Amino acid sequence: MTATKQHKKVILVGDGAVGSSYAFALVTQNIAQELGIIDIFKEKTQGDAEDLSHALAFTSPKKIYAADYSDCHDADLVVLTAGAPQKPGETRLDLVEKNLRINKEVVTQIVASGFKGIFLVAANPVDVLTYSTWKFSGFPKERVIGSGTSLDSARFRQALAAKIGVDARSVHAYIMGEHGDSEFAVWSHANVAGVGLYDWLQANRDIDEQGLVDLFISVRDAAYSIINKKGATFYGIAVALARITKAILDDENAVLPLSVFQEGQYEGVEDCYIGQPAIVGAYGIVRPVNIPLNDAELQKMQASANQLKAIIDEAFAKEEFASAAKN
């Protein structure tokens, strides 16, 4: 996609709870001029396209339709939400093999269409499926992006903001690592309007050390809490995807926490996608933003990456996945 292109086209693959919520976010936030939706349940997809189109008189003109894979050929962005949902009691990593098969089938058909844009992956386990999208597509690593820890970081900022009594937009803090159980908070660089978090807390006494531990656990386990109550999470990730989409289509060079390919940014972390901040624009990842981690944080990053690598290596040792790899 050229940064000056006026007509911006998004194809969404997967019209489940996350996908349809994302489509709704694009419509209400006036993002993109064309939205095609692909799903195996074609009648439901046609219904969603019609329903979303009825909101356009309140927003802005947009072409919305039930698409097929041939429509990907001139898209700027393809967003992948298709996959088996996470069930109560199931971790994101439990989903690996069944969603890898779906991912392989979907990515192969998208590439066959002649697609030359950017992949944005949200299906879980997102770090593993972003890696597999890169492998199956043969695309440059900069043009394959995962939603990563974007939602986790938003949850973290919101939880901190609620505890200390400020707007979440004034809290600057990141969750890094796997989007899942091995993620970690980068406490060493968290700040409120430029004031280091620990300095802020020392001056204001809003929360003690155990309170911070409990806050992080609530952030890390938020998805499990929501899944147990309503069966799935979709609104938060949908808005996170819309934010990433806007940054790409508008060539914002925004810094967002995403699944980013690792090639030595952090010692001992290579050949995997994992959550870290990165600059993102019209051509995908411009460059990662390598927050200097303290020793404890680096160890957590390495442990998280090692867990992901073990799963990736096991999966791609199987002929059905290894034979489809192009990278």
UniProtKB/Swiss-Prot annotation:
The UniProt annotation places beta-D-fructose 1,6-bisphosphate binding at: R157, H172
**Record GO biological process:** glycolytic process; lactate metabolic process
Query: Keyword Metal-binding: yes or no?
Result: no
Query: Kind of enzyme, top EC level?
Result: oxidoreductase
Q: Can the keyword Cytoplasm be found in this entry's annotation?
A: yes
The record lists the catalysed reaction(s) as: (S)-lactate + NAD(+) = pyruvate + NADH + H(+)
Q: Which UniProt keywords apply?
A: Allosteric enzyme, Cytoplasm, NAD, Oxidoreductase, Phosphoprotein
| Subcellular location, record wording | Cytoplasm
Q: Mind telling me which Pfam families this protein's record contains? A: Ldh_1_C, Ldh_1_N
Question: Which pathway does UniProt place it in?
Answer: Fermentation; pyruvate fermentation to lactate; (S)-lactate from pyruvate: step 1/1
Q: Give the active-site positions.
A: H179 (proton acceptor)
Q: Where, per the database record, does this protein carry Phosphotyrosine?
A: Y224
Assigned GO CC terms: cytoplasm
As recorded in UniProt, its EC number(s) are 1.1.1.27
Record-annotated residues binding NAD(+)?
A: V18, D39, K44, Y69, G83, A84, A122, A123, N124, S147
How is the activity of this chain controlled? Allosterically activated by fructose 1,6-bisphosphate (FBP).
The lineage's top-level taxon is Bacteria
Q: Where does substrate bind?
A: Q86, R92, N124, P125, V126, D127, D152, S153, A154, R155, T233
- GO function terms (MF aspect): L-lactate dehydrogenase activity
What is known about its subunit structure? Homotetramer.
Family of the protein in this entry: Belongs to the LDH/MDH superfamily. LDH family.
Q: What functional role does this protein have?
A: Catalyzes the conversion of lactate to pyruvate.
State the protein's name. Answer: L-lactate dehydrogenase
Q: Per the UniProt entry, what species is this protein from, by scientific name?
A: Streptococcus pyogenes serotype M1
